[in-house]
């Protein structure tokens, strides 16, 4: 039996890397309201910003076009990557499952470090834990796979309605732990939004991160995120197993239908979801969850289809390569967005958090992503992998791969 190896440059599919870069842009836009601490502010201080009017428009934009859509795309791409790993290692005679589980273990450790040391909004840990379930579906037929995926995506709506009508919430214990930590560290409702801005030592920042880690677990439970992520992983696995991304031309008709129906139905429903979110969920948590279920996934599929159609029509444009650069270094850039956000907005850095309107936070997010395009492009001129990608691959395959490109000629 041979040891597997990561995907080489010549084996990569630029559409997947470009889609991953596109997803990173959306994730950056979705996360920076939290990095800037704007999301933690009460309504009154938000209304005092000179940008309050455009901030409200920006919030509507985020709910309609961004919220949930790009983590959905990122999760689907993760499932596609799982299928590619298994297929490549099967061809080499390697044990794909062992390699995959090892890969997930190290992703979990990277995510855990990200969660408790940098930013409490980490998603990697959940990806790793849920990802470990994917091999259980390896032998499922395509139809069975899609049934499971649809079921997992729909379960959160049922759970939310049950919680709404019974008044019993699964995260109640986590909420207790969260407030116990707040009491212990002196984090109050009054200073909650300003704590990270005013924490000028890493030890003070670490107190909030510890409390934030518990809050993140609460968010996963309240949002039933584990079911959603597993369902999206399975859809990605189905797409990857059928190799749809290798022959987009023959799928043009299907892609056009998905694009038309996905956007014409998904975006209006996303507007209803945005109204529900902006108006404190007037129809209750369950109905808000239903709006999310219908709007976010349909719109996300529409985004993917539109992206692929544009690629087919303008595939010689430089845009695709520009988006592919950060996509090839997705792990490095995802954590890099956190490091930059901490430096700009937290007290251990420039301390700009909670002092700027939402629109400024989003403009900073766009600037960060543009920087990452340039950084990734420059890095990949000299190196085969991103820095964290290289470490992750070496740990996964238990061997040291050449990092610099001059090794390819030797």
For the regions a language model picked out, list residue spans one by one.
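Specific transmembrane alpha-helix
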Residues: 72-87, 125-138, 224-247, 295-314
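N-terminal signal-anchor module of multipass membrane proteins
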Residues: 2-78, 85
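Internal alpha-helical transmembrane segments
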Residues: 84, 88, 92-163
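Membrane-proximal soluble regions of multi-pass membrane proteins
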Residues: 57, 381-410
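Functional transmembrane helices that form membrane-embedded active or gating regions
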Residues: 8, 12-23, 258-259, 311-340, ...
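Long hydrophobic alpha-helical segments that form multi-pass transmembrane helix bundles
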Residues: 151-231, 235
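Alpha-helical transmembrane segments of multi-pass integral membrane proteins
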Residues: 281-381
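Solvent-exposed interhelical
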Residues: 97, 135-148, 238-260
């Amino acid at each position: 039996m041979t040891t597997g190896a990561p995907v080489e440059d010549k084996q990569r599919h630029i559409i997947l890397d470009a889609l991953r870069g596109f997803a990173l842009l959306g994730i950056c836009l979705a996360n920076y309201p939290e990095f800037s601490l704007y999301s933690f502010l009460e309504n009154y201080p938000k209304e005092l910003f000179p940008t309050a009017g455009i901030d409200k428009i920006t919030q509507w934009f985020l709910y309609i076009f961004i919220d949930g859509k790009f983590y959905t795309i990122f999760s689907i791409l993760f499932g596609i990557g799982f299928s590619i790993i298994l297929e490549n290692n099967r061809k080499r005679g390697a044990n794909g499952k062992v390699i995959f589980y090892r890969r997930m273990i190290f992703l979990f450790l990277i995510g855990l470090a990200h969660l408790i040391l940098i930013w409490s909004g980490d998603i990697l840990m959940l990806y790793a834990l849920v990802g470990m379930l994917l091999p259980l579906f390896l032998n499922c037929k395509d139809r069975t796979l899609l049934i499971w995926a649809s079921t997992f995506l729909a379960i959160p709506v049922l759970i939310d309605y049950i919680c709404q009508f019974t008044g019993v919430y699964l995260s109640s214990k986590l909420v207790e732990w969260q407030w116990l930590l707040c009491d212990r560290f002196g984090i109050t409702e009054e200073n909650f939004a300003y704590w990270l801005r005013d924490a000028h030592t890493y030890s003070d920042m670490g107190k909030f991160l510890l409390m934030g880690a518990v809050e993140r677990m609460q968010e996963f439970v309240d949002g039933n995120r584990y079911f959603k992520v597993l369902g999206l992983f399975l859809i990605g696995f189905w797409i990857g197993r059928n190799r749809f991304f290798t022959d987009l031309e023959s799928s043009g008709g299907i892609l056009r239908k998905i694009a038309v129906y996905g956007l014409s139905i998904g975006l209006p429903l996303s507007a209803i979801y945005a109204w529900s979110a902006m108006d404190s969920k007037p129809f209750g948590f369950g109905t808000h969850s239903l709006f999310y279920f219908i709007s976010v996934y349909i719109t996300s599929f529409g985004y993917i289809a539109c992206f692929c159609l544009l690629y087919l029509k303008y595939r010689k444009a430089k845009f695709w390569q520009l988006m592919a650069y950060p996509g090839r270094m997705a792990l490095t850039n995802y954590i890099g967005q956190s490091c930059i956000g901490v430096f700009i907005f937290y007290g251990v850095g420039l301390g700009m958090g909670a002092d700027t309107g939402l629109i400024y936070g989003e403009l900073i997010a766009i600037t960060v992503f543009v920087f990452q395009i340039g950084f990734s492009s420059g890095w990949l001129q000299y190196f085969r992998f991103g820095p964290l990608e290289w470490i992750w691959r070496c740990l996964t395959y238990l061997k040291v791969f050449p990092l610099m490109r001059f090794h390819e000629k030797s």
